[in-house]
Structures are given as C-alpha cells and as structure tokens.
Amino acid sequence: MKLIDTHTHLYAPQFDSDRSELIHAAKMAGIQSVLLPNEDASSIPAIHALCEQEPDFAYPMMGLHPTSVDGDYINEMKKIEHALTRRKYYAIGEIGIDLYWDKQYCTEQKAAFETQLQWSLDLHLPVAIHMRDAFHETMDSIYKTGADRLKGVFHCFGGTTDEWNEISKLTAFYVGIGGIVTYKNNVLSETLKHIPIERIVLETDSPYLAPVPYRGKRNIPTYIIETAKKVADCYAIPVEKLAAITTRNSLELFAIPDKSIFDKKI
C-alpha cells in the first residue's frame, strides 16, 4: 500500500530531534512522498534543507501563510516571490485566509492571497489553500482571480455539505482530508458521503491535528494510515483501494514523480 502525505510541516522544529527516524518509519510504512507547505520567509531554509536531504521523498511548496500576514506583508511577499525564482516548487502554498484568530489583517490577507493565486496561474502551479472561518472570503478571491483556470486543494478540509457543493463547482480542485475525520461527532464524516473519492487527497498537517488514537499528541506522517483507514470506512472500500485512488489523485494534482514505477519488477 502506497500513500502520499500532501501536507506536512516535517521541516518544523518539533521534528528536529528525530526527523531522520520518522522519515525512515514513514518510508517503511508505505509513504512514498510528502509535500511541504511553506509558512513565511523564516521557514524557507528548513524546507530547502529537508528537500536536499530527501530529494526523492520531500517536495516543497512556496507561499505565505495567512497567519503570517501583517502590516509588513509586502516585504515578506517579496522574499517569497524571490524564492520562487530560485528552484522548482510543486505548489503555491500554503496560502489563504484565516479569520479564526484575528480579523485585524483581513484586507491584507485577501490581497496576499489573490497575489499568490495569480502567481500560481503565471507559474502553472496548483495552490494549497488554508481556509479557516473565511469560506465566503476565500471563494470570492478565487472567483475574482480566475476560478476556471486555478487548480489546487483545500487543505485540512472539514466543511459542510453546502460548502462542498460550492467547492465542487471548481472542477480542478480537491479537498485534503486529515486527522479530523477520525474525531468524534465531526461534520466531515457526513460530508464525505457527498464527495466523489476522485476529489480527495490525504494529509496529516503534522505536527498538528493527530488522528485518533493519537489525538493530542504530536502528529507524524506515519499516522496518515489511521486517517486512510477511517476514510476507507466512510467509502466502504478496502483501505488499499483508497490508498491507490488518493495517491493517483495526489500525483495528478502536484505532478511529483511516481515512485511506484520503481517498485515494479522488470
């Protein structure tokens, strides 16, 4: 069984003490690739270092996280834009609008988001969207920038069926399913009944949002298996089939190398 973790902060300081061991464990568990979303200019060196250490396993994104947007965001955006000229990236992310913690910089978040959406169009890259308490604002920016030309994933999706119905109109978008699907009384388990399996990818968002039975602990890429099992149950299919479909979806969206071809015997 092969899996792809489409969203992990494996470069973060929370993994400094045992990163190599966790990567080895992930590979042994069948995780063939991980995608690394950027946060701000300060996280760029760590992402690059991990991708250089694991060039056939870790694939970088580049973007400015909405909670890193403040009154000086334009200077931060210049650093992100410069980074995009320096090497290959597989998505613009993670980007979006987050009004959960603070609405002070809502205007700046929206401007940064729309600029980065345009970058994705210019560079022909997918986007990894962070959206929290900002569904309508996020969708407004997507339609304003070019909904018919954009592609990407709504990372850490936990929305309602009504929200999915709106997202479903964006035919080149997927939703990223993480550990919250394993939580008791979550809305997502019901929403999944309405989402075609061809429109989902799996993620951990590690070190955050660990799935049951690890909830409350540091999340790690290997725990994606627990999420895969739960999602497979929701679709009433074997987890191996779920893994194959979501891995194919991830490969199509992010255009990362398909490691499974190296597993085939000639």
Please describe what each predicted stretch is:
Residues 1-266:
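Mid-domain alpha/beta scaffold segments of enzyme catalytic cores
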